Structure formats: C-alpha cells, structure tokens
Swiss-Prot record:
Key words, A-Z: Cytoplasm
GO CC annotation terms, alphabetical: cytoplasm
Cysteine disulfide partners in this protein: none
InterPro entries hit by this protein: RecX_HTH_1st, RecX_HTH_2nd, RecX_HTH_3rd, Regulatory_RecX, WH-like_DNA-bd_sf
Lineage top rank: taxon: Bacteria
Organism: Pasteurella multocida (strain Pm70)
Cell compartments where the protein resides: Cytoplasm
Single GO biological process annotation from the record: regulation of DNA repair
Protein name: Regulatory protein RecX
Family: Belongs to the RecX family.
Any one Pfam family match given in the protein's UniProt record, by short name: RecX_HTH2
Length: 164
C-alpha cells in the first residue's frame, strides 16, 4: 500500500488518498483517463490532485488509454458488437479519441465480416433461409443497432450459398 505521506509526481506533490483511490480502482479493472477523472471529481479531489495522480499512473503505465481501447474493443466484440457501436461507446462513454480507437483496431485487425456472420449464426440460426420481409427487417435492425455495417452482413441474409 502507498504510504500516508505525500508522493512526488514530477514537480508537484500529490496526496496519497487520491493515489490510493485510483490504484484501488485500477486493481479491479482497466479504466480510461476520462473515467478516472470523472470518478475522482465525484469524490471531490482537486483538479491539481487529479492531474498529478493521473500523470503519475500513466508514467508508471498503470493507466494507458491505448491498452484500455484494445481491451474494450476485444471485450465488446466478443459480446457480439460491431466496430461502429464499439467506437461510439469508446468515444462518448469512455472519452477515447478516434485516433486511439483506429490504432487499436489496426493493432487487433479483426475480421468484422466474419464476426458479423458469427453473430448472425448465433442470434438467427436460420439466417440463410429468411424470406419474410418483417423477419429480414428485424435482422437488419438487430445488426445495425449492434454496430455492423450493411456490407458486413446483408449478403448473408436470405442467401443459402454462403452457408458453411
């Protein structure tokens, strides 16, 4: 555990309650800088304490937005979501920049079309035989709301020649 005395971070002093709080959060899971900043503001830490603590954690590589984006992208893809939905969540809810999201996607290089097919198979096992317009609309709404582009899934719906 970190001592009760103040720690040095660059030229500024940082209180150990702020550092203890952030380390406790990071011990449980990854957080984006934006999420940690919001949580620390809710706890009433000063902007200087927040800046110093986050800079210290980033210097020690305890907090890294790129690593967070890669882990989040992998996790959400495994839960059945497409890139558009994941990107929106990372930007709006987690405060990650478009550049970092693109870097994470390039690093991981997932095959979104194959992923869309996997999601289709799981959610709609008879996807290749769908001819009913209402059911096709349901499939389209589901896939679009989960962040898939039409070109990633449309040609599979109602076409048996793509069945493996």
């Amino acid at each position: 555990m970190i001592s009760k005395h103040c720690k040095e971070a660059g030229n500024h002093r940082m209180s150990s309650p702020a550092l203890n709080y952030v380390v406790g959060l990071l011990a449980r899971r990854e957080y984006s800088e934006f999420e940690l900043r919001c949580k620390m503001q809710e706890k009433g830490f000063s902007e200087q304490e927040i800046d110093d603590t986050l800079a210290f954690c980033q210097q020690k590589n305890w907090q890294n937005d790129r690593r967070f984006a890669e882990n989040y992208l992998t996790f959400r893809a495994q839960r059945g979501y497409g890139f558009a939905r994941i990107k929106q969540e990372l930007q709006q809810l987690k405060g990650i920049s478009s550049a970092l999201i693109s870097e994470a996607e390039q690093t991981l290089a997932p095959d979104w079309q194959h992923h869309a097919l996997t999601v289709l198979r799981k959610k709609f096992p008879q996807y290749a035989e769908i001819t009913d317009l209402k059911l096709k609309q349901k499939v389209w709404r589901y896939m679009l709301s989960h962040g898939f582009k039409p070109e990633q899934f449309a040609h599979y719906v109602g076409h048996t020649e793509y069945e493996e």
